[in-house]
Amino acid sequence: MDLVLETLDHYIFDDVYAKIAPVELQRGIDDSLVNALSLNKIVSNSTLLHETLSITNSLKRVNKDVYGLTPFLFDFTEKTYASLLPRNNLIREFFSLWAVVTVFGLLLYLITASLSYVFVFDRTIFNHPKYLKNQMYLEIKLAVSAIPTMSLLTVPWFMLELNGYSKLYYDVDWEHHGLRKLLIEYATFIFFTDCGIYLAHRWLHWPRVYKALHKPHHKWLVCTPFASHAFHPVDGYFQSLSYHIYPMILPLHKISYLILFTFVNFWSVMIHDGQHMSNNPVVNGTACHTVHHLYFNYNYGQFTTLWDRLGGSYRRPEDSLFDPKLKMDKKVLEKQARETAAYIQEVEGDDTDRVYNTDKKKTN
């Protein structure tokens, strides 16, 4: 995240913070408080400022250093010191990260889900008896309202990374198995986070936890791509924990981290798009996740079926999900709806918070 933040600080945030909290405000603050809060001090001598910039920009940044003390991608400029809040100030880091993660999260969700809806999504789902009235609007509304809070909860993890508490690194020794190391990291990341999400997901299905946190996401029995992030923000936070824990305990390249975070969001959209293209027994694809939304107690995994098989919660998707003719067959849907209703009764007790497109009594 330091690479992203340094880029945004250089092009945007240095200017923004200079206007919101100019360094001139330091005149009215006691020196002891300035030092305690790590605030910038006014440099009235332009020669001294340029000498400071020259020295600072010549220092080579070590990956473990605290972010903002020395440059890495871009040299420091006069604007770097124009705000009362320096780049490494914890208050500035907090608000900058919250803004970045929120905006990036919203854009990634809306763009990826929209592209999936246009090019991949199976629109026959609109005719499914368990599709809700105004469902897509409700999914987007919940996701857009949840993402800022989810971002807020994850900011402390990114702050730990910025302050040198992670095992993220940048330099790669290509001559000594650097590429192999990178590929192994991708595999271990998927393995570790798949296990972490499985455990978190099973916990979220404990009755009390389910009703408090996870139930909003299971309002969608058949999904559109916009259901991918439509859940309670604390639910989303717990399911993301393994992504943040991994770089705290295992090495991971910084660029790989950004790529994998983008991939995770893409995957979340994909398994909610209703397009059952893969029936791979290893991959926890769209069909497996459709089974989870319909029948609640199966297929908790994110990327693979490994942990569900080990945990006894794997359920093979029905063949009808992969047959375009059978997928929307009336008898198949009626059987599916009856079984889903039984699981709703078992898990939730009633179905009063759902209004279906086909439910004339509720819609009239």
Swiss-Prot record:
What top-tier enzyme class does this entry carry?
oxidoreductase
Q: Where is it localised?
A: Endoplasmic reticulum membrane
Residue ranges of the TM segments: 94-114, 142-162, 181-201, 249-269
EC numbers listed for it are 1.14.19.20
Keywords of the record, alphabetical order, are: Endoplasmic reticulum, Iron, Lipid biosynthesis, Lipid metabolism, Membrane, Oxidoreductase, Steroid biosynthesis, Steroid metabolism, Sterol biosynthesis, Sterol metabolism, Transmembrane, Transmembrane helix
Which reaction is the catalytic activity of this chain? a Delta(7)-sterol + 2 Fe(II)-[cytochrome b5] + O2 + 2 H(+) = a Delta(5),Delta(7)-sterol + 2 Fe(III)-[cytochrome b5] + 2 H2O
Instruction: Fetch the InterPro entries from UniProt.
Output: Fatty_acid_hydroxylase, Sterol_Desaturase_Related
Membrane-protein topology: Multi-pass membrane protein
* Reported cofactor(s): Fe cation
Where the record places motif Histidine box-1 is: 201-205
- Any Pfam family hit: FA_hydroxylase
* All residue ranges annotated as the Fatty acid hydroxylase domain in the record: 188-312
Main localisation: endoplasmic reticulum
This protein's source sits in the domain of life called: Eukaryota
GO BP terms: cellular response to xenobiotic stimulus; ergosterol biosynthetic process
Q: Where is this motif: Histidine box-2?
A: 214-218
Which pathway does it serve? Steroid metabolism; ergosterol biosynthesis; ergosterol from zymosterol: step 3/5
Which GO molecular function terms does the record list?
C-5 sterol desaturase activity; delta7-sterol 5(6)-desaturase activity; iron ion binding
According to its UniProt entry, what is the function of this protein?
A: May contribute to the regulation of ergosterol biosynthesis.
The UniProt similarity line reads:
Belongs to the sterol desaturase family.
Q: What is known of its domains?
A: The histidine box domains may contain the active site and/or be involved in metal ion binding.
**Name the record gives this protein:** Delta(7)-sterol 5(6)-desaturase
